[in-house]
Amino acid sequence: MNQGKVWRVVKPTVGVPVYLGAVAVTALILHGGLLAKTDWFGAYWNGGKKAAAAAAAVAPAPVAAPQAPAQ
């Protein structure tokens, strides 16, 4: 590890959470930007055409209108 001496300046109890937090924030910003700027990424996360086809296949059949009683 070529940057091993950094822990002489920054305590690991501070540096590791800050580093992991920065990675998490970067990932959230990246994914948020992809969702906001593209139309395919949200569909990819939702299953795309497969999910739409499955939802259409599971849709309930239409119900017939009630008939007026015969007099």
Curated annotation (Swiss-Prot):
Coiled coil: none annotated. The keyword ATP-binding does not apply. A bacteriochlorophyll binds at H31. It is found in: Cell membrane. Residues 37-50 are periplasmic. An active antenna complex lacking the last 16 residues has also been isolated from DSM 149. This is Light-harvesting protein B-800/850 alpha chain. The chain crosses the membrane at residues 16-36, 51-71. Pfam families: LHC. Antenna complexes are light-harvesting systems, which transfer the excitation energy to the reaction centers. Its main location: membrane. Residues 1-15 are cytoplasmic. One of its GO terms (cellular component) is plasma membrane. It is a multi-pass membrane protein. Keywords: Antenna complex, Bacteriochlorophyll, Cell membrane, Chlorophyll, Chromophore, Light-harvesting polypeptide, Magnesium, Membrane, Metal-binding, Transmembrane, Transmembrane helix. An alpha/beta heterodimer conjugated to 3 bacteriochlorophyll molecules. The core complex is formed by different alpha and beta chains, binding bacteriochlorophyll molecules, and arranged most probably in tetrameric structures disposed around the reaction center. The non-pigmented gamma chains may constitute additional components. The keyword Cell membrane applies. GO terms for molecular function: bacteriochlorophyll binding; electron transporter, transferring electrons within the cyclic electron transport pathway of photosynthesis activity; metal ion binding. Belongs to the antenna complex alpha subunit family. One of its GO terms (biological process) is photosynthesis, light reaction.
